[in-house]
Amino acid sequence: MTQLLLFLVALLVLGHVPSGRSEFKRCWKGQGACQTYCTRQETYMHLCPDASLCCLSYALKPPPVPKHEYE
């Protein structure tokens, strides 16, 4: 009985397969993450090479470029 329990525990531990996206691809100088969807706390910056979205936290988002008025 003990061996059966040990065998089942070993199967559960060794059989665990992490998801394919456990390591997010990085973008935007390593500060963003390539994801399918951005969360509410993130903003979309550009497309990653695999056509996913580069999501960047609002706290890390660069300030907008000031618009110069042309005469």
From Swiss-Prot:
- Family to which this protein belongs: Belongs to the beta-defensin family.
Identification of the protein by name: Beta-defensin 124
- Gene that this polypeptide is encoded by: DEFB124
Describe the function of this protein.
Has antibacterial activity.
Methyltransferase listed as a keyword:
no
| Keyword line | Antibiotic, Antimicrobial, Defensin, Disulfide bond, Secreted, Signal
Q: A biological process (GO) annotation for this entry?
A: innate immune response
Organism of origin: Homo sapiens
Give the residue spans that cross the bilayer. Answer: none
InterPro entries, per database record: Beta_defensin_dom (IPR025933)
The set of disulfide-linked cysteines is: C27-C54, C34-C48, C38-C55
